[in-house]
UniProtKB/Swiss-Prot annotation:
Belongs to the YjjX NTPase family. This is Inosine/xanthosine triphosphatase. It is an enzyme of class 3 (hydrolase). Keywords: Hydrolase, Magnesium, Manganese, Metal-binding, Nucleotide metabolism, Nucleotide-binding. It catalyses: XTP + H2O = XDP + phosphate + H(+); ITP + H2O = IDP + phosphate + H(+). Homodimer. Pfam families: NTPase_I-T. Phosphatase that hydrolyzes non-canonical purine nucleotides such as XTP and ITP to their respective diphosphate derivatives. Probably excludes non-canonical purines from DNA/RNA precursor pool, thus preventing their incorporation into DNA/RNA and avoiding chromosomal lesions. NCBIfam families: inosine/xanthosine triphosphatase (TIGR00258), PRK05074.1 (NF003459). Substrate binds at residues 71-72. Its EC number is 3.6.1.73.
Length: 179
């Protein structure tokens, strides 16, 4: 018996993002072989998005770029960003998923950031570099991320992306409810 295949392109070569996409799709489609491939995709926004809207647009831009480059069943993009809300600074990620002619946008959980971290970001640094310096780690953005460090490993960047992907997949899982 030949197994059905779902091909997924992720707009990044970051293993955290690729693994999150693969894990989410395996949970959603357990009877399918999930083929996940990452590719470099420009976000068209600053390397460290500092607003909600730039972060969302970065994910959308990455998905659209991937759609123009290669054929797949699904296209995923995850863009991490930061903003200062009424309750203080926080980091979060937007998820953009394209399938056929439909685009779904989701967002991961908000992680409150220490003010000293936010101030370093305002000065032009990227979150991963700030966290590496603060916690004496190396390339944390391709591991547990700020989420893993600040929650003592109880949550990770990958777990946040995985959950956000599953939620953003709702329109594709229930197309009759999302005309």
């Amino acid at each position: 018996m030949q197994q059905n295949i779902i091909k997924v392109i992720v707009g990044s070569k970051n293993p955290v993002k690729i693994n999150a996409a693969a894990n989410a799709m395996a949970l959603l489609f357990p009877d399918y072989e999930i083929q996940t491939q990452g590719m470099d995709a420009p976000s068209g926004v600053p390397a460290q998005p500092m607003t909600d809207s730039d972060t969302r647009q970065g994910a959308i831009n990455r998905v659209h770029y991937c759609q123009q480059q290669i054929e797949a069943d699904y296209y995923f993009a995850m863009e991490g960003g930061v903003d200062c809300f009424e309750f203080g600074p926080a980091t979060f990620a937007y998820i953009a998923i394209a399938h056929q002619a439909r685009l779904s946008i989701g967002r991961g959980a908000l992680l409150p950031l220490p003010m000293q971290v936010y101030q370093a970001l305002e000065a032009g640094e990227e979150l991963g570099h700030v966290m590496d310096r603060l916690f004496n780690t190396v390339n944390i953005k391709q591991k547990g991320g700020a989420i893993g460090l600040l929650t003592h490993g109880h949550a990770t960047r990958e777990s946040n992306y995985t959950q956000a992907i599953i939620l953003a997949m709702a329109p594709f899982l229930n197309p009759e409810l999302y005309p």
